[in-house]
């Protein structure tokens, strides 16, 4: 069973950085000024690999925030007072 995974960021540029790190081909879109990536995960392990890719990209690129939504859950990454890009 496929699970829809939605990744949201502060901007399309931030979403493009994350899309490059995902283990599947993904494209970033802009929606109401936010960056959005939509992908389908085939398993819990693949969902976890998406979350790990977002986490790595978030830290490496010093993004302001990112949110991963899947099933009825979400994982939020925030800068919390650290200097950020952009």
Language model regions located:
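Short glycine-rich, basic-tinged beta-strand/loop micro-motifs
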Residues: 1-4, 30-45
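Short, flexible coil/linker elements and helix-boundary hinge sites characteristic
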Residues: 1-3, 21-23, 62, 75
């Amino acid at each position: 069973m496929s699970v829809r995974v939605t990744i949201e960021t502060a901007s399309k540029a931030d979403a493009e950085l994350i899309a490059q790190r995902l283990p599947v081909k993904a494209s970033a879109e802009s929606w109401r000024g936010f960056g959005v990536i939509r992908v389908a995960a085939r398993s819990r392990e693949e969902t976890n690999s998406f979350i790990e890719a977002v986490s790595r990209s978030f830290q490496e690129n010093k993004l302001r925030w990112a949110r991963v939504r899947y099933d009825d859950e979400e994982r939020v990454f925030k800068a919390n007072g650290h200097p950020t890009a952009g």
